[in-house]
Amino acid sequence: MSFRADRIYLEFLRLTRRLSNQQIMMLLAVVVGVLAGLGTYLFEMLLHGIKSGLIRWFPVDSAHILFLIYPAVGIILATLFVKYIVRDNISEGVTRVLYAMSRRNSRIARHNCWTSIVGGATTIGFGGSVGPEAPIVLTGAAIGSNIGRLARLNYKHTTLLLCCGAGAALAAIFKAPITGVVFVLEILMLDITAGSVIPLLIASITATTMAFMLRGFDPILAVTLAPADAFELWQIPLFILLGVLCGLMAWYFTSMNSRVGAFFKSIDKQYKKWLWGGAILGILIFVFPPLYGEGYEGFTSLMHGNAQELFNNSLFYRFRDIDWVIILFVIATMFFKVIAMSTTNTAGGVGGTFAPSLFVGAFTGASLALVCNTLFGWEVSIVSFTLVGMAGVMSGVMNAPLTSIFLIAELSNGYGLFIPLMITACISFAVDYYLDPDSIYTKQLRQKGELLTHDKDQSVFVFLKLEELMETDFLRIKENMTLGDIVHIISTARRNIFPVIDNFGRLIGVVQLDDLREDMFKHEKYGHPISDYMIPPPDKIIEHEAILSVMEKFEDKHAWMLPVVDKQGRYLGFISKSRILNAYREQLVKIQQ
């Protein structure tokens, strides 16, 4: 494999020897865009092939018992695929990309170029209530990362290609090139320059062109705004209200996802997760069929004014023409979508939260429009409120108002709703950020100190690892030693601080050389226990603790050296502030190269 990689690299050098670095990156961006577009096409074909073969023959006027079975089968197949073939974590695609950027030098395993396609399509095709975007983004990012690896690019350029792949994949699946670029700039990229934007644009345009060639020009959500759907000034209070509702729904989305995840993590056996996940998901889809799969058909029906189609294959099919039943059904589906999505992901399925956030947003906007039209007799456009609601919830869930605004603007073939999109997306973002400042992608990474942000100073610290900076060449002193016992020990020491440990290796204090100097040559004091000279450390660092947290302890305690212990309190080594700062400077140079 290494020999093959060397040959590819030499051929790459031969072909590009007369090109500048910028031209090489533009050329590689085209390659990434083409491959990301092909990957998206394969994903779509596999997904719709599975889904169509399983449910297209169901009668629309009654529920089908297979809705109880399909989701469990999909979760089991996806879990077995991941456990026995992939043997790696391919869930939470966007989070995995962020983790690779912060902890793996933007290196993503080669298998991610195809395994997310198989796992995601299997999960969603069998009814898993998740979105295809996260697996496809991980696929595109893996393509970019591995092309960067083959070309032996540095960290900065590899990261740029990774982002090109992620943005290109998203652009291809929605046929929305601007959205792909904005998504990367808003969520993924740390260092934004003119030189990085051009390859992003090229990759997104190339992938979108591939999508047009392979799948036609029809958008994923075929909707055209009619004159009756145009924005009017009197609707501004309603869009403000919609923004608040979307912010609350975004907070519910994120918090419920965490709660369901915690529930499944408390289950010790995988087969129990299958049983619980299959049962919960099967029952929800049996009662609310719009929850099957990514859910695009559901909010497409709403945007076309065909809310009755939501009742196809439902137990409530006979009540589809009753207005208040429609409203209750839409609201219930909206809330249960989050539970269905979280259950799918945490029970073993492979998928993302992108499409579910659009689904919940669409149903939130449609609910408000239906209530206004039914209860108050107003003529509010369900199409407009459905589209704007999609942007609202997505803005809050992902903490990405610009991505949500441009996505809906591109999907609706124009910017007629730009003002309400901006109003609702910004208010939703503000409400959700007030309730929970982390997005659904960043919550776990921030808690672990592994999140890259647009604050470059903080982000550089994320790259540093405690175990790589810890120093271990300190002479240890046992707690039962006397001054006489350690005089000969410290005479050969290169350090001026010594950890004191008990018989179990636990750190109980430290001894500083300066505190011993006065008595070192007084033989009458050699019998004094070392505890007479021992002091407690200013603070302790726990193994694997984030460097940002370590620096905060240094600042709080005004210290320059702190001991590192494991979770049981056993001594491991010391970490110095000066070594962290030196590593920080080296990492900053590496990023900027």
Show which residues each predicted segment covers.
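Ca2+-coordinating acidic residues in Ca2+-binding motifs
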Residues: 142, 512-515, 576-579
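Glycine-rich acetyl-CoA-binding "A-motif" of GNAT/NAT acetyltransferases
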Residues: 507-510, 571-574
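Alpha-helical transmembrane segments and immediately membrane-proximal extracytoplasmic
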Residues: 1-468, 472-473, 477-498, 502-508, ...
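Structural signal for short hydrophobic segments within the conserved structured cores
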Residues: 473-477, 532, 537-540
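PAS and related sensory helical modules
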Residues: 526-531
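The conserved cystathionine-beta-synthase
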Residues: 477-494, 500-501, 520-523, 540-560, ...
